[in-house]
Amino acid sequence: RRQRQMCIRDSRQIMYNSKLLQTEEFNKMHSFCLDFIKQSLAESTAKHIVVVTHHLPTLEVVAPHHKGSVLNSAFATELGQLIADNRIDAWIYGHSHTNIDAEINGTKVVCNQMGYVFENEHIANGFEPGKFLVL
């Protein structure tokens, strides 16, 4: 946990209740949000369901050069079973600054992140300004 806090920029910059956001607070927020997603999925009668989160919903879309990193828990949560068990048309995510799409049990897991423009990540990571999603 300490290594994650030292290596991730967000851990040194995000304030919560007038102090740096701590892992425990983040985990509480994560649990609250995940419960909301689960409840919303269970109650939805919508024809199409799209989930949008900041973080990666599966390790399947972690960049190859980050596979196995101890820092992955700061970027992704393995929700592959949740995705497979629900009728989600698409899950749109961000945070990783790499653009990797996947499909899990018919669900499109997609992103189109610019990343840090001042570091030219939008060029290196294949940001597509005209990209769109068809359901």
List each language-model region with its residue ranges.
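Histidine-centered catalytic micro-motifs
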Residues: 52-57, 89-99
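Active-site-proximal loop/helix segment associated with metal-binding centers of metalloenzymes
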Residues: 1-50, 55-66
